[in-house]
UniProtKB/Swiss-Prot annotation:
Protein name: Inner kinetochore subunit MCM16
Function: Component of the kinetochore, a multiprotein complex that assembles on centromeric DNA and attaches chromosomes to spindle microtubules, mediating chromosome segregation and sister chromatid segregation during meiosis and mitosis. Component of the inner kinetochore constitutive centromere-associated network (CCAN), which serves as a structural platform for outer kinetochore assembly.
Compartment(s): Nucleus; Chromosome, Centromere, Kinetochore
GO cellular component, one term: kinetochore
Signal peptide per UniProt: none
Amino acid sequence: MTNSSEKQWERIQQLEKEHVEVYRELLITLDRLYLIRKHNHAVILSHTQQRLLEIRHQLQINLEKTALLIRLLEKPDNTNVLFTKLQNLLEESNSLDYELLQSLGAQSSLHKQLIESRAERDELMSKLIELSSKFPKPTIPPDDSDTAGKQVEVEKENETIQELMIALQIHSGYTNISYTI
């Protein structure tokens, strides 16, 4: 490129940046004006809403640029360096848009698959709850400490009964007493 065409290109880039910035500010101001008129007061946007507005502004700016490029492409001049660069930028933008469309399609199918999996899981959970309600509640096995305590109690009762029997035998005068029962 010659020196003058480089200067032209730099000037075009500078003007384009200024145009994009002014247009972005215009869109932001128009959005705020619309929200104020609609709600009769200033609206405070959350971070997510602010980000969505910025994306919308970017899309509007890109649409405006694309429209200008299409108008320029309708009058092709193959010797024009600007035409060639703009055509390359438009092709690159189209390829990026296609990649974005592909990734959004993949994300959409994964999201759909996730929703279907969640629905299947919920259905299986409801079936499991229904089936589990048909079975009796499990009985709680007795604690080992309870059985050990009952065993000690039974042994004490046995000793007491044995002592009572011996006392009865002595009291009744039975002579053939066996002290071990």
